[in-house]
Amino acid sequence: MTETPNTSSEEIQTSEPSPDNELQVLQQENANLKAELQEQNDRYLMALAEAENSRKRLQKERTEMMQYAVENTLMDFLPPIESMEKALGFASQASEEVKNWAIGFQMILQQFKQIFEEKGVVEYSSKGELFNPYLHEAVEIEETTTIPEETILEEFTKGYKIGDRPIRVAKVKVAKLPAKGNSDSNEEKE
């Protein structure tokens, strides 16, 4: 069996792609590679964004933890500072020697207050203000008709806050109007 020249050229023509077919194949490969490149680029950008978000979240958590630690430490100093303030309140009634000691303790107390101020801790006054459950804890209620209801009559423990956020609420006595049933029963007894 011998091959004829026509047969072999036909085989060659069918095995070699035409330039148009080759161009289409290359264009398709190019499109596929571009799509794959775009997909890889999108994945890279997504991973980069996730890493940046994680970094920001960790930084925020770290800052919050540091703030919480500072707050807790400062809170631990409040009772001794308040005790020192109360003790210094009686110094004016003491001897000259005790008054001299009190001056030194007053200076130390000022240093503590300055540290609190530098850390953003401020004391807030409550007496005469309206009761706010976010800033106050009512530990006592007094019925009265002479003062508007929910007015703070007395402050037992000072409140402190950092910015607008309380770190310790003030413990207070709050005014309340007498119940109508109580005033009627008191009138009947008379």
From Swiss-Prot:
Keyword field: Chaperone, Cytoplasm, Stress response
GO molecular function: adenyl-nucleotide exchange factor activity; protein homodimerization activity; protein-folding chaperone binding; unfolded protein binding
Segments of this protein annotated with the region Disordered: 1-21
Protein's GO biological process: protein folding
Cell compartment(s), UniProt: Cytoplasm
SUPFAM superfamilies per record: Coiled-coil domain of nucleotide exchange factor GrpE (SSF58014), Head domain of nucleotide exchange factor GrpE (SSF51064)
GO CC entries: cytoplasm
Subunit and partners: Homodimer.
HAMAP family assigned: GrpE (MF_01151)
Function of the protein: Participates actively in the response to hyperosmotic and heat shock by preventing the aggregation of stress-denatured proteins, in association with DnaK and GrpE. It is the nucleotide exchange factor for DnaK and may function as a thermosensor. Unfolded proteins bind initially to DnaJ; upon interaction with the DnaJ-bound protein, DnaK hydrolyzes its bound ATP, resulting in the formation of a stable complex. GrpE releases ADP from DnaK; ATP binding to DnaK triggers the release of the substrate protein, thus completing the reaction cycle.
Protein name: Protein GrpE
Lineage: Bacteria, Pseudomonadati, Chlamydiota, Chlamydiia, Chlamydiales
